[in-house]
């Protein structure tokens, strides 16, 4: 029992580490660059982590409890979906920047009054579209990583109940880790200094190009090096 509890607790640490995967950080960076508040940036990570946890837990439980098998080809297909999503996020960010006019600093963040306290004000500032985008991104990432996480669970704990607990604690770790990451990423976009306005736009463009380029690299690697489109 003690060893199982230790393994479950270790799942939180692995979840924190998992949040730092390059494709995860690149994806959320392009979303965070759309926000203009520190708290909103942190919420991007929280929603991403929520979506990631839902699919990791659901798919992981199916694998652990019902012996559902994920074939190598299916795993590569899910990873390709992540690559295409990264490309889409990058293109969307670049196109939005191209449409935006040069605005005076501070005009791009809309006020919402003071009728909603604390968390709800921050949530309204983030907006439903950004919350949905963050959650969907996490869902896709979680689906692609579910097989690997399930194998990690099977090699760590034996009891099915402990395995389920591990998946949930792992999910909490990814939520906590990504919330911290996106909060830090949001700092330059939340700064209100006029001198940083052009820098923020350049940084936002950089996140879009990075997401597009990294997604393209992954797509080519998965399709041809790993052999998804070659039938290997």
Predicted regions and their residues:
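Membrane metalloprotein/metal-transporter helix-bundle signature
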Residues: 1-232
């Amino acid at each position: 029992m003690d060893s199982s509890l230790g393994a479950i607790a270790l799942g939180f640490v692995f979840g924190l580490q998992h949040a730092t995967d390059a494709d995860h950080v690149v994806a959320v960076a392009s979303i965070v660059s759309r926000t203009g508040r520190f708290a909103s940036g942190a919420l991007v990570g929280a929603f991403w982590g929520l979506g990631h946890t839902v699919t990791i837990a659901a798919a992981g439980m199916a694998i652990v409890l019902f012996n559902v098998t994920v074939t190598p080809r299916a795993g590569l297909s899910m990873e390709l979906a992540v690559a295409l999503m990264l490309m889409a996020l990058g293109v969307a960010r670049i196109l939005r920047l191209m449409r935006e006019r040069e605005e005076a600093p501070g005009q791009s963040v809309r006020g919402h009054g003071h009728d909603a306290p604390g968390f709800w004000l921050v949530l309204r500032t983030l907006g439903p579209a950004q919350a949905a985008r963050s959650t969907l991104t996490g869902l896709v990432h979680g689906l692609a990583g579910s097989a690997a996480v399930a194998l990690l669970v099977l090699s760590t704990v034996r009891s099915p109940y402990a395995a389920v607990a591990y998946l949930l604690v792992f999910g909490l770790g990814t939520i906590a880790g990504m919330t911290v990451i996106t909060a830090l990423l949001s700092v330059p976009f939340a700064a209100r200094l006029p001198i940083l306005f052009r820098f923020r736009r350049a940084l936002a463009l950089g996140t879009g190009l990075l997401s597009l380029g990294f997604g393209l690299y992954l797509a080519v690697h998965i399709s041809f090096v790993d052999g998804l489109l070659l039938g290997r």
